[in-house]
């Protein structure tokens, strides 16, 4: 019986989009070796992504920086919308499955996702679902590969090493600081509402004052 799994990647980075992925099909057809994408190498994720796409239905939704920075929304709402968008691409009435909960209240998150999908589906949201269910783990891989490709494209566009895009990554912070010093503004791929972006702008302003 076909079921589904949904997860997202890129909720926390200061650079670039967030991606959600939904995978639907027979759970028994999930490729061997699927595990939470964060524990796999990039090459292994790409290999499994190809195998998942060859054997399952896959939907991917992107949430760009301008939507993330919109003051009229929040990350929980955007995560619900992205998961529902991806899920709506692969499901039909009567299907059931699991999504990785992006809210402290799992039941509320699951209801919100289900309510945004046109098909009549049964959604169960759980924290850490990518560790428990192969279909969610497969969706985690697809979402992370989409995010990886996005970061690679950004690095190529800026002709620079931008790191992973996460605030904890020193390469990302160095790229952001250097860009702001040179251009006097954030790169378009930066989430301006993130504290890391504000810090980069503040440091550049302070440096300019010190030089004056």
Swiss-Prot record:
PANTHER family: RIBONUCLEASE, RIBONUCLEASE H2 SUBUNIT A. Its cofactor is Mn(2+); Mg(2+). The gene is rnhB. A divalent metal cation binds at residues 7-8, 100. Endonuclease that specifically degrades the RNA of RNA-DNA hybrids. It holds the Pfam family RNase_HII. Manganese or magnesium. Binds 1 divalent metal ion per monomer in the absence of substrate. May bind a second metal ion after substrate binding. InterPro entries: RNase_H2_suA (IPR004649), RNase_HII/HIII (IPR001352), RNase_HII/HIII_dom (IPR024567), RNase_HII_arc (IPR020787), RNase_HII_hlx-loop-hlx_cap_dom (IPR023160), RNaseH-like_sf (IPR012337), RNaseH_sf (IPR036397). It is found in: Cytoplasm. It is an enzyme of class 3 (hydrolase). It comes from Halobacterium salinarum (strain ATCC 700922 / JCM 11081 / NRC-1). Belongs to the RNase HII family. NCBIfam families: ribonuclease HII. GO terms for biological process: DNA replication, removal of RNA primer; mismatch repair. This is Ribonuclease HII. The lineage of its organism: Archaea, Methanobacteriati, Methanobacteriota, Stenosarchaea group, Halobacteria. It catalyses: Endonucleolytic cleavage to 5'-phosphomonoester. Keywords: Cytoplasm, Endonuclease, Hydrolase, Manganese, Metal-binding, Nuclease. Its main location: cytoplasm. Residues 1-206 form the RNase H type-2 domain.
């Amino acid at each position: 019986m076909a079921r589904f799994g949904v997860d997202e990647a890129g909720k926390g980075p200061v650079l670039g989009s967030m991606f959600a992925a939904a995978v639907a099909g027979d759970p028994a057809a999930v490729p061997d070796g699927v595990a939470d994408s964060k524990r796999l190498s990039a090459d292994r994720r790409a290999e499994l992504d190809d195998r998942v796409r060859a054997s399952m239905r896959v939907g991917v939704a992107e949430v760009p920086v301008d939507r993330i920075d919109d003051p009229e929304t929040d990350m929980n709402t955007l995560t619900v919308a992205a998961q529902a968008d991806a899920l709506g691409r692969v499901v039909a009435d009567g299907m059931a499955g699991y999504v990785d909960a992006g809210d402290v209240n799992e039941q509320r998150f699951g209801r919100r996702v289900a309510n945004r999908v046109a098909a009549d589906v049964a959604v169960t949201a759980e924290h850490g679902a990518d560790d428990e269910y192969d279909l969610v783990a497969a969706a985690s891989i697809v979402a992370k590969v989409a995010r990886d490709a996005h970061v690679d494209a950004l690095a190529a566009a800026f002709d620079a090493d931008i790191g992973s895009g996460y605030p904890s990554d020193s390469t990302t912070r160095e790229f952001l600081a250097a860009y702001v010093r040179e251009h006097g503004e954030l790169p378009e791929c930066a989430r301006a509402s993130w504290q890391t972006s504000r810090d980069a702008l503040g440091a550049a302003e302070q440096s300019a004052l010190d030089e004056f």
